[in-house]
């Protein structure tokens, strides 16, 4: 990682570590070594330590004095809170759709759906298109900037979503749901769009129950539990 001024460098390290947690590169429950992280990024321990503190404030990292730092396990309660916020905002944005939709944004969404249908997409490419699709729908309502607030609050939700994507052989079911939402929006059928959106967003809860049945170690059960210092593999 290129060295810049101190403030920029710390921000870059924080964003990098946050992304590693959200993409499951740093798995739920994994032990975190400040020395190893600093060495891998070519920086001192100080900005790494500061970044871990910020991530702890977001609930993405747990710091136990004299024991160490660990990636927080996915917390179903935090997932539910983030889902509640996201659903309220996205359904509200559908209610706020104007009678005349911006043709440029509609075109972007249509192109996005075409790219989602590609067979060679990896998980992160699809996840990025998924995020852009939902943000685009909010832009249609004139509230695209609200997505920043939603995105900042859904760290645990995004990890659960990624776990769900890894469980599915193909994202085709999600693409079909996106198309149903898009068609309802462009046809002016807001009630149908709301129903389709609600079904789509709540699918994550089924994913959590299915994954927790065979990989309970990825999920939080008791916030007071001190973890064992070991690494957890999400998948082989």
From Swiss-Prot:
Cross-referenced PROSITE patterns: HTH_GNTR (PS50949)
Keyword Thylakoid in record: no
InterPro entries: GntR_C (IPR011711), TF_FadR/GntR_C (IPR008920), Tscrpt_reg_HTH_GntR (IPR000524), WH-like_DNA-bd_sf (IPR036388), WH_DNA-bd_sf (IPR036390)
Residue ranges: DNA binding: 34-53
Molecular-function GO terms, alphabetical: DNA binding; DNA-binding transcription factor activity
Keyword entries, A-Z: DNA-binding, Transcription, Transcription regulation
Segments forming a coiled coil: none
A Pfam family the protein falls into: GntR
Domain HTH gntR-type: 7-74
Keyword DNA-binding found: yes
Stated name of the protein: Uncharacterized HTH-type transcriptional regulator in unstable DNA locus
Organism: Streptomyces ambofaciens
